[in-house]
UniProtKB/Swiss-Prot annotation:
It comes from the Bacteria. It comes from Mesorhizobium japonicum (strain LMG 29417 / CECT 9101 / MAFF 303099) (Mesorhizobium loti (strain MAFF 303099)). Disulfide bonds: none annotated. It holds the Pfam family UPF0262. InterPro entries: UCP032146 (IPR008321). This is UPF0262 protein mll6455. Belongs to the UPF0262 family.
Length: 161
């Protein structure tokens, strides 16, 4: 991919389904950071898209499925992928539980305890990110860092829903 192609194969806007509602301040902070980081640096290319990016992404949940609605910069629809949440459900649940422990720990635990929880949290996050990459394989090409940030947003949607 040339330098010009790389700057076009990216997301410039992320929208989460706001109809689900808001979550805890900690979760909302994770959402805001993930969106900011994702917009700043990402690699995102719908497979077989004959047009060019950059792209806008709307993430939502519909009937216990994860919906990736991809559009061009001008809002023209490119593709919508609907993925089952089943492969991610256990990881998201475990990740949510360990995040709650982490948020509790940063308020009252020792640095070594916080570090131990954070290592587990990062491991689960990596597992979820890889699962998401696998689920998007053949649909949307993303790199691992993009998958990590998208996994955070999937978790936020799931926690709200």
């Amino acid at each position: 991919m040339t330098g010009s192609d790389q700057t076009r194969a990216k997301l410039i806007d992320i929208e989460l389904d706001e109809s689900i509602g808001r979550s805890t301040p900690d979760v909302e902070h994770e959402r805001a950071v993930a969106i900011f980081d994702l917009i700043e640096e990402n690699s995102f290319q719908p497979v077989n898209d004959s047009g060019a990016g950059p792209y806008r992404l709307k993430l939502s949940l519909a009937e216990q499925r994860l919906v990736f609605a991809v559009a061009r910069e001008d809002g023209t629809a490119v593709v919508t992928h609907i993925l089952s949440l089943t492969p991610l459900r256990r990881i998201v649940k475990d990740y949510y539980m360990i995040c709650e422990s982490y948020y509790d720990a940063i308020r009252s635990s020792t640095p070594s305890h916080i570090e131990a929880i954070d290592m587990g949290r990062r491991g689960l996050h990596n597992e979820g990110s890889q699962t998401l990459m696998d689920r998007l394989s053949g649909k949307i090409d993303i790199d691992f860092d993009t998958a990590r940030r998208l996994f955070t947003l999937v978790c936020v949607l799931h926690w709200r829903g």
